[in-house]
Amino acid sequence: MLFGVIVVTCFLLSRSANPVKFFNPTFRQPSEGEGKVKLERILERAATADKTVIVTTLNEAWAAPNSIFDLFLESFHIGNGTTTLLKHLVVVALDCKAYDRCLAVHTHCYLLNTPGTNFSGEAFFMSPIYLRMMWRRIDFLKSLLEMGYNFIFTDTDIMWLRDPFPRFYPDGDFQIACDFFWGKPADLFNQPNGGFNFVKSNNRTVQFYKFWYESRIKYPKLHDQDVFNKIKFDPFLREIGIKVRFLSTAQFSGFCQPSKNLNRVCTMHANCCTGLHKKIHDLKVVLEAWRKFSSTPPKLRASRPISWKIPQKCRL
């Protein structure tokens, strides 16, 4: 199902050089077809030559100035080879204030309509609003695959420090980061984290995402990540032939199992951490450590591993 956009106290026109837009306070919910056309237009502008986009979701709580979203964008600007990736980033706003904030600072913004649900506040882990938000995300990503787009999905509390594309497995259909990685990329006992994944659009991944989304009915009290941990062993995945690969925490890292070597790390996720203020504090520590690392002479970087002292407030 493709979702339309809702226009309630939101700017109507797409992002331009001048962020001041025409404002229309009149409620109007476009049809599903109109929403699909708008989304397709955004995807076409953002996609790479092989129809790949980078996607993140954003709500009001994380969109506020000096909050998670600003740190997320900053990481692209100071990362190694990541600035040019911003032109491929599509920010999917879950409420009007997040949408307005996105339009003020970024190019590709899309407002995802969720009738009867308010996603603007901080969604605490495993709360009913959190579960609805996670499954809404899976359904939306499924629609991108159906439209023929490959994507990297990234949570906004992930700092992009290096271009991840060269680190993906060429044979993987569905590649996912981990809370805990046990050493082998095809080992189903790795503990994945749904906050970062690279998915190629093909019949296998479309079938898989449909199966994943439908499995929420079988496991009504679990979020998408826990449901994935159930279905990754299901014979259906072998039947459709999907190749699942788990990404090493040495490169695609997080606070659960932080990489100790800044010479290798691509991304750093504020996982295993609850509380917005804790995340913000520790992600600022990450960016400051990265700035110091980046200013270190290359010969010194190569001569010994350079690490960082994280997590701090997010410590388990």
PLM ranges: what are they?
Residues 1-68, 73-74, 81-85, 104-108, ...:
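Juxtamembrane luminal stem/stalk of type II transmembrane Golgi/ER carbohydrate-processing enzymes
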Residues 45-50, 102-104, 144-145, 168-170, ...:
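Extracellular/periplasmic catalytic domains that process cell-envelope and extracellular macromolecules
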